[in-house]
Structure formats: C-alpha cells, structure tokens
C-alpha cells in the first residue's frame, strides 16, 4: 500500500486502528497466545511509515 496516496485524515484513522492492533498483539504476547510474533514488527513499521508521510506533508517535503 502506498501511504502517500491517502489523505492525512485517512492515514490518522489507519494509525489509530494499527495502534489498537499493536496493543492487542502485545497483550497476546504477554499471555502467550501470539501466533505470529513478526506481526508486531510489521505493525510498528507501518505506523512509522504513515507518521513519516504525515510529517513530510507538514514540513513540505515531496517524494
């Protein structure tokens, strides 16, 4: 998915959903129920990528 094609509001909505997913994944990790531990890394990196796009827009960097 190319995050730069989304609007800032859509990105913020997706970041919120991914943060909730990350919370649930960490909860599963703590209780020993997590089946795919690499998903935590994927979600964290997706959040970072989206926040980077939002920040680039704020300071006027175009990619």
UniProtKB/Swiss-Prot annotation:
Pfam family of the protein (one): Ribosomal_L29
Q: Which UniProt keywords apply?
A: Ribonucleoprotein, Ribosomal protein
HAMAP family linked: Ribosomal_uL29
Q: Which family does it belong to?
A: Belongs to the universal ribosomal protein uL29 family.
Q: What is this protein identified as?
A: Large ribosomal subunit protein uL29
Q: Which SUPFAM superfamilies match?
A: Ribosomal protein L29 (L29p)
Gene Ontology, cellular component aspect: cytosolic large ribosomal subunit
A GO molecular function term, named singly, is: structural constituent of ribosome
A GO biological-process term: translation
This protein's species is Bacillus cereus (strain ATCC 14579 / DSM 31 / CCUG 7414 / JCM 2152 / NBRC 15305 / NCIMB 9373 / NCTC 2599 / NRRL B-3711)
Q: Which NCBIfam families match?
A: L29 (TIGR00012)
Q: Which gene encodes it?
A: rpmC
Q: What is the lineage of its organism?
A: Bacteria, Bacillati, Bacillota, Bacilli, Bacillales
